[in-house]
């Protein structure tokens, strides 16, 4: 199965989370994982993927302009139905607790629903999600005054999302 992680990152925080998600997905031996910054991400690759995970820093509860521009270019894939039944998941970072993590993830999920994708979140029984995460995806607060780019809890949350996407994708593609 092929999984594509696409991210926008301005201060490296979201890149660290994207890399953790890719690591988690790679724990499944059947997963072939690709990861690209949105500036290098090729929308033509999406047709060949079984799962697509995209994310960005939250900007007042909305998608970063870099990722939004990229998503807006997916119209022809929608017209051709190329992403229908592909697994999708999202992730986001913000600088403050009230930076709009969940609103940003809602905004990231919406285009996936329009594309006909099967959106996967993190259920409450995922240990990493119980106290630190969100049901909508991996959302991590990275305070600007912190010495570390990402907390260990944030990295573990990212890995958990990657594992979940690869597990669900494996289950869905096993019968093909």
Curated annotation (Swiss-Prot):
Xref: InterPro entries: Flavodoxin/NO_synth (IPR008254), Flavoprotein-like_sf (IPR029039), FMN_Rdtase-like_dom (IPR005025)
SUPFAM superfamilies: Flavoproteins
Domain (Flavodoxin-like): residue spans on this chain: 3-162
Molecular function per GO: FMN binding; NAD(P)H dehydrogenase (quinone) activity
PROSITE patterns: FLAVODOXIN_LIKE
Domain of life of the source: Bacteria
Biological classification of the source: Bacteria, Bacillati, Bacillota, Bacilli, Bacillales
Source organism of this protein record: Bacillus subtilis (strain 168)
Identification of the protein by name: Uncharacterized protein YhcB
An example Gene Ontology CC term for this record: membrane
Gene3D superfamilies attached to this UniProt entry: 3.40.50.360
PANTHER family reported for this sequence: FLAVODOXIN-RELATED PROTEIN WRBA-RELATED, FLAVOPROTEIN-LIKE PROTEIN YCP4-RELATED
